[in-house]
């Protein structure tokens, strides 16, 4: 399965997921947000615009912005080289989503969770390639505070 080094998948369109997506897309990454409840895309697009406006105040030359794509199909993340998971802090939900996305993306794709509650070893349990599942827990909001706690399994 081919992956695109410039393609990022974001799981979850909540506050943290939107912040990540706005940051990635502002710096030119092809970013797709997966959320099964994408009923309010216009609200999400407005939030991305607000994030970009904040970043424009911090950086002089953000000229490579890419439109964020929204999807309710995990398969739309197939070519991503990096996945940032941001679903609610429900262990079984996170584990199920990580297990599903792991079967869709390349074996080399890094899957990071924004969790503040679970260890990577817990999220890796039952995964085919557990070494690529990490915690990438941001300080909030990630588009404004450039600090990410990275925890390996």
Residue ranges and their predicted role:
Residues 110-153:
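Rossmann-fold dinucleotide-binding core
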Residues 32-34, 84, 134:
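Hydrophobic/aromatic beta-strand patches that form the interior of the parallel beta-sheet core
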Residues 25-26, 77, 141-145:
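Short, flexible turn/loop "capping" segments at secondary-structure junctions
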Residues 1-51, 69:
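NAD(P)+-binding Rossmann beta1-loop-alpha1 motif at the extreme N-terminus of oxidoreductases
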């Amino acid at each position: 399965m081919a992956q695109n080094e410039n393609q990022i998948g974001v799981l979850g369109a909540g506050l943290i997921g939107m912040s990540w997506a706005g940051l990635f897309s502002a710096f030119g990454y092809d970013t797709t947000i997966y959320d099964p409840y994408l009923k309010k895309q216009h609200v999400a697009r407005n939030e991305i615009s607000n994030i970009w406006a904040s970043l424009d105040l911090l950086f002089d030359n953000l000229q490579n912005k890419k439109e964020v794509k929204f999807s309710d199909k995990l398969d739309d993340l197939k070519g991503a080289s990096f996945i940032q998971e941001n679903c609610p802090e429900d262990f079984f939900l996170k584990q199920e989503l990580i297990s599903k996305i792991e079967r869709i993306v390349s074996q080399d794709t890094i899957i990071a969770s924004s969790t503040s509650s679970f260890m990577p070893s817990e999220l890796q349990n039952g995964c085919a390639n557990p070494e690529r599942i990490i915690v990438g827990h941001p300080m909030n909001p990630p588009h404004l505070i450039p600090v990410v706690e990275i925890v390996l399994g």
